[in-house]
């Protein structure tokens, strides 16, 4: 009985750097406006969201600096790999995010991209940047947890 945790979800890309560099306050799922060649590249797994972030532009949330590789089989109508991509959110969600960004100094960082029921989705974290000492503490805790797990395995 090998069942997946979430059968309708196929994760394409993770942003592991985000959890190291930021404190997450809230996670929001958003759709992405894509062209045909972009969706085919995403299905091939040729996506990088490690250095990307989202900003407000003309009352919309836009994903910047995400890299979706050009699709080889697309001829003249291929897309630009580093285009800005509009995120699909409700007006209420957009206003909430804009308020947090302006008032509280939060930033919007993508944490993962996945397919849900055949549609490409992206998980955006409302996050605040970590200082250098916070990053050191995170690394220290991670190393300590690894060491504890090793000791437990040895003693068993």
UniProtKB/Swiss-Prot annotation:
Which segments carry the region annotation Disordered? 133-156
Q: Where is the composition biased (Basic and acidic residues)?
A: 133-147
Q: Record's InterPro entries?
A: SmpB, SsrA-bd_prot, SsrA-bd_prot_CS
- State where the protein is found: Cytoplasm
The GO molecular function terms of this record are: RNA binding
Q: Biological process (GO) annotations?
A: trans-translation
The alphabetized UniProt keywords are: Cytoplasm, RNA-binding
The family note in this entry says:
Belongs to the SmpB family.
What is the name of this protein?
SsrA-binding protein
Q: Which organism is it from?
A: Pelagibacter ubique (strain HTCC1062)
The gene from which this protein is expressed is smpB
């Amino acid at each position: 009985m090998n069942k997946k945790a979430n059968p309708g979800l196929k994760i394409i890309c993770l942003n592991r750097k985000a959890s190291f560099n930021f404190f997450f306050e809230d996670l929001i799922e958003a759709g992405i406006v894509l062209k045909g060649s972009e969706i085919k590249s995403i299905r091939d797994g040729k996506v990088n969201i490690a250095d990307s972030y989202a900003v407000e532009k003309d009352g919309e949330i836009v994903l910047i600096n995400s890299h979706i590789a050009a699709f080889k089989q697309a001829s003249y109508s291929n897309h630009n790999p580093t285009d800005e991509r509009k995120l699909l959110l409700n007006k209420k969600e957009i206003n909430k995010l804009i308020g947090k960004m302006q008032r509280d100094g939060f930033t919007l960082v993508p944490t993962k991209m996945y397919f849900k029921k055949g549609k490409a989705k992206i998980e955006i974290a409302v996050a605040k940047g970590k200082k250098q000492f916070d990053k050191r503490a995170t690394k220290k805790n991670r190393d300590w947890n690894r060491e504890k797990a090793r000791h437990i395995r040895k003693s068993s």
